[in-house]
Amino acid sequence: MKIALIAHDRQKPLIVKLATAYQPILAQHELFATGTTGQKIIDATGLSVKRFKSGPLGGDQQIGALISENKMDLVIFLRDPLTAQPHEPDVNALIRLSDVYEVPLATNIGTAEVLLRGLDQGLMAFREVVHDQDSNPINL
């Protein structure tokens, strides 16, 4: 699966801890991240992460573009709900796209853990089933 990892500045230490704790699970998947978040995860874990621009410089939009092309399967976006963000419209657009394209999205550590544990247990096959049905329609 293709997984995006994003975190606001005050949440970056937390997403690094998450990536460290779930490194064996994350290592089995293709990882993407905004610039600084991705570098911090790489430095802490050695995981392979495709990095985009920093969120305020368009990284959120780059990940949103992948979502809109059905090229992203899961998004972990640890937001800082107590600090105003200069790129808040980009953040809202990314969340909206996740809803439109039915991409599982975690915006806090509790939900992120549930998604990663579910992924590890094979409980997140919905998108794969939908993609298989879309590419192999059954004619009745």
Curated annotation (Swiss-Prot):
A molecular function (GO) term: methylglyoxal synthase activity
Q: Which domain of life is it from?
A: Bacteria
Q: Catalytic positions?
A: D60 (proton donor/acceptor)
- For this entry, the protein name equals Methylglyoxal synthase
Q: Does the keyword Signal apply?
A: no
Entry GO CC: cytosol
As recorded in UniProt, its EC number(s) are 4.2.3.3
Q: Which InterPro entries match?
A: Methylgl_synth, Methylglyoxal_synth_AS, MGS-like_dom, MGS-like_dom_sf
Q: What's its job? A: Catalyzes the formation of methylglyoxal from dihydroxyacetone phosphate.
Q: Identify the enzyme class.
A: lyase
Binding residue positions for substrate: H8, K12, T34, G35, T36, T37, S54, G55, H87
Residue ranges occupied by any MGS-like domain in the UniProt entry: 1-140
Q: State which residue ranges cross the membrane.
A: none
One GO biological-process annotation of the entry reads: methylglyoxal biosynthetic process
Acyltransferase among keywords: no
Q: Family per UniProt? A: Belongs to the methylglyoxal synthase family.
Enumerate the UniProt keywords alphabetically.
Answer: Lyase
The reaction(s) this protein catalyses:
dihydroxyacetone phosphate = methylglyoxal + phosphate
Encoding gene, per UniProt annotation: mgsA
The record, for Gene3D superfamilies, names: Methylglyoxal synthase-like domain
